[in-house]
Amino acid sequence: MNIKILSLAMLLASAAGLATAYGCEMTFTLIGPAGGSAKILPGRSVDLIQGQQYVLRVEFYEDHKKCLHDPDETIFLVAGRQWKPGDSSQPLALGSSISWRSDGRTNTAEIRFTAKDKGTCELEVIRECDKGGYDELFTFKVK
């Protein structure tokens, strides 16, 4: 009986260790021009309407505690280049600099952008760290 309890305790301890070894958990919500919202997932395409303004709400929870990387270190690439306001060559026009709000271990940014050019555009979101980080690709189809 004691061996079963010890085995269970070791299993739970290793599961807890694995959970803290992975990077931040990120969620993405797209808010449309009419105010409707939907969760979006990496790897799935999202339809946008040319000329319309959207808000991408990004939330991540530092599930491994004591994150050494500031939220501002999150990298957003549009069409392979740093997403920045005032860059007229980018198909998704960023309204202003990306700023984060922190509430304990939860960090949130609301990113306003306009779907400027028709066609397919990719947004890559990257957080680099030794605990798994984050690197995912979102595909937007502007019609």
Language-model-detected regions and their locations in the chain:
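Bacterial N-terminal signal peptides
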Residues: 7-17
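N-terminal edge beta-strand
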Residues: 22-57
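Low-complexity "stalk/linker" and mucin-like segments enriched in Ser/Thr/Pro/Ala/Gly
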Residues: 38-42, 77-109
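Low-complexity, serine/threonine/proline/glycine-rich extracellular segments that form mucin-like
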Residues: 44, 57-78
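Exposed beta-strand face motif in extracellular beta-rich ectodomains
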Residues: 54, 119-123
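Short, hydrophobic beta-strand segments
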Residues: 107-117
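Beta-strand-rich extracellular modules
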Residues: 126-130
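Edge beta-strands of extracellular beta-sandwich domains
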Residues: 134-142
